[in-house]
Amino acid sequence: MAALRPLVKPKIVKKRTKKFIRHQSDRYVKIKRNWRKPRGIDNRVRRRFKGQILMPNIGYGSNKKTKHMLPSGFRKFLVHNVKELEVLLMCNKSYCAEIAHNVSSKNRKAIVERAAQLAIRITNPNARLRSEENE
């Protein structure tokens, strides 16, 4: 079967691709890079001084049409079993399935086979599937 394609694939425009880093995380090892809002009374990042690192705010949000969209043009739907896969039957042109991390390899095989029958794309079909020669 040919590769499954989305119904429409709009151009995804990100307003910012660089990560927002924590103030002074480049200066000290103990301060991790993960973003934390500065709350100090004299903090220049919080007061938005020129030349300081930028803070995340509502203006950096994505376009409503392309929010949560993968580069392939699909949106992800987390699947734990074959029954949950049936939900995507009518919207297989806009949503793709992603098998949850705690699903056994036996159930993964069943999900992948059923998805092929329903023409549903899976983002991680090869995860935790061992070949026969290794068993």
UniProtKB/Swiss-Prot annotation:
UniProt xrefs under PANTHER family: 60S RIBOSOMAL PROTEIN L32 AND DNA-DIRECTED RNA POLYMERASE II, SUBUNIT N, RIBOSOMAL PROTEIN L32
Location(s) in or outside the cell: Cytoplasm
InterPro entries, A to Z: Ribosomal_eL32, Ribosomal_eL32_CS, Ribosomal_eL32_sf
Organism (species): Bos taurus
Entry GO CC: cytosolic large ribosomal subunit; synapse
N6-succinyllysine carried by residues: K50
Record keywords, A-Z: Cytoplasm, Isopeptide bond, Phosphoprotein, Ribonucleoprotein, Ribosomal protein, Ubl conjugation
Keyword Cytoplasm on entry: yes
Name under which the protein is recorded: Large ribosomal subunit protein eL32
